[in-house]
Amino acid sequence: MYGRGPMWDNRIRNGIPTPPVTGTSSLQYFLDRLAAGVSLPVEGHVLLVHECALKADGVRAARAALKEPYLAICPLSNLFIHNTLPSIPLMRESGIPICVGTDSLSSNDELNMVAELRAVQEAYDVPLGELLGWACLNGARFLGKEDILGTLEPGKKPGIVHIKNLADGKLTEASESVLL
């Protein structure tokens, strides 16, 4: 965020273009760039991914600039790259819908949604039902597919996954998913 450190030095040494150093968060940089190109607030769903540096002012700025923001977290990638998770309590308090993903194998050892959810549950006291809503319904809503995906209801055709090896409603190291 400040234009220093080994990654920055490596980019300079190798002639790789460097992003502008603004001293602001990536979210604020994105919102500032967005405001320079379009009228705010932006209509439609906008997915804000990772947001490990999210603070209350970022939530306020996102709500002001975006009519329908969504947050996407990839917990194991966040831990792999930043050795931290985003502020899940702040995200929950914000009222902005949270989605969960796996990111990619370039920043993760496996693509395993149960492991992603378990990483959140190990760090924060988030009920399993809420986590499943982030993983299923919120993703379907973001994609505009909640009429056919995201929940088990008449007329919908979601994939069905059974999560085995729970302990008192919590995910465990032994928890795994089985596609039904």
Residue map of PLM features:
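Short beta->alpha transition motifs characteristic of CBS
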Residues: 1, 165-167
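Histidine/acidic residue-rich metal-binding segments in metalloenzymes
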Residues: 1-70, 82-98, 147
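His/Asp/Glu-enriched, well-ordered alpha-helical/loop segment
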Residues: 40, 84-165
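Active-site beta-loop-alpha junctions enriched in small/polar residues
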Residues: 51-54, 76-78, 103-105
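Short beta-strands and strand-loop turn motifs
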Residues: 71-75, 99-102
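A generic structural motif
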Residues: 76-81, 131
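Short, Lys/Arg- and Gly-enriched loop/turn segments at beta-strand edges
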Residues: 167-174
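Short peripheral tails and domain-boundary helices/loops at the edges of structured domains
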Residues: 178-180
